[in-house]
């Protein structure tokens, strides 16, 4: 995994990869499903969608590092922000999404892709939530595309 850090640092001319947690880096590099990555890219390109991070990873990684992770799969250009880390709705990530939307009233269409916080997202964002149980599969992609095209 140390070799992976060196390889990515050289490939992207970015020494930040040398300081990244090697297990997180390996998870992004090896474990992200290529088909799911392509589906996410397709959503971004087809619908001119942007990615706003609400992942728990933002709790210990700044946005610049998250972009570096996404860069490995050429998705960094779609990352435009992150939700605030303010706990509302009983410490739910859905509350953070609500705050982000309140702070960005120009957003008229959005989809939430998540593998957790199901109860809260289904309660507060039933029309925008796509539960990705394991990866962004074809059925979940179709649901997300339908939401973004409505």
Describe each region flagged by the PLM.
Residues 1-87:
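Alpha-helical substrate-recognition element adjacent to the catalytic core
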Residues 64-150:
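C-terminal cap/substrate-recognition subdomain and adjoining C-terminal extension
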């Amino acid at each position: 995994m140390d070799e992976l850090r060196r390889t990515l640092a050289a490939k992207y001319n970015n020494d930040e990869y040398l300081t990244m947690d090697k297990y997180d880096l390996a998870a992004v590099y090896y474990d992200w499903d290529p088909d799911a990555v392509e589906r996410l890219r397709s959503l971004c390109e087809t619908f001119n969608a942007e990615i706003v991070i609400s992942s728990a990873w933002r709790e210990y990684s700044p946005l610049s590092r998250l972009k570096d992770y996404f860069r490995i799969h050429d998705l960094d250009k779609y990352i435009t922000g992150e939700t605030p880390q303010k706990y509302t709705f009983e410490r739910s990530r859905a509350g953070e999404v609500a705050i982000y939307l309140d702070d960005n009233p120009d957003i008229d269409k959005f989809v939430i892709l998540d593998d957790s916080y199901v109860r809260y997202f289904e309660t507060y964002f039933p029309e925008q939530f796509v539960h990705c149980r394991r990866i962004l599969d074809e059925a979940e992609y179709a649901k997300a595309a339908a939401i973004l095209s409505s």
